[in-house]
């Protein structure tokens, strides 16, 4: 799959997920076969004002063996343009813009999925990003805002007209958040509406899902999100490739990478959520969740890993 001038080794993409797609998770996903990984969403305005918490989201030292996209969110074209030009983004291969986040505090600012109701602003935001870089600019959207507002095909056309290189479609509405089923027919309609690559997202958990999404929608790529949490090897499974997965070794590598650029306290907090997902397919899942509630120090973290993994 090719996005603009960036060639991917396959059509599988790790979805951006706030608080989860840190450098450790992105590295492991790349090792197990992801063709592209994407950062957690980063505030364009925060980047412009050099928010100290933003730099950690942009770590690329352990990028793995595939291209990496940075995902920005914002609704002000000027801030988007300045963010794209920021030196901290120089090592990213693709610029992605979030137009799908359903969280209330983002939506109330007119950002994320709120943009699905404002095609004129969508055009201006994408155009601003495209004008600021030679790299491909992509956009992640949802099916629509409310369940009776399926605007993805219209928004995708606007993105293409503004110079967007690809569009990823989470086939749920903002109203759904992450509940109910993804409507893959929306992905098909988007694919029929534009000439740029379309990436499908939603309810892909096994190889059969991956193959069916490709066949029924005609999408060019498939983005995997929650199904990859604690299971970076899903990218090998979806491609029907052999793999070996040592969960303890994966956790330790994850911690090692985070420790290269984050303070110990932040590493511990970051790993609390990650450990729950690493444990979800083990017989110790409940014990791990209970132990995490009392996790305070690195020694506690190591004890949990040694005891349950």
Language-model segments: residues:
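N-terminal small/glycine-rich loop or linker at the start of catalytic domains
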Residues: 1-13, 45-68, 101, 106-109, ...
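Glycine-rich, positively charged N-terminal anion/phosphate-binding segment
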Residues: 1-2, 17-93
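Alpha/beta catalytic cores of nucleotide-metabolism and tRNA/nucleoside-modifying enzymes
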Residues: 8, 18, 24, 132-134, ...
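Hydrophobic faces of well-ordered beta-strands that scaffold small-molecule active sites
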Residues: 12-16, 37-39, 68-72, 95, ...
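Active-site beta-loop-alpha junctions enriched in small/polar residues
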Residues: 17-19, 42-44, 73-75, 100-102, ...
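Alpha/beta enzyme core
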Residues: 81-111, 120-196
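Hydrophobic alpha-helical membrane-association signature
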Residues: 118-125, 250-251, 271
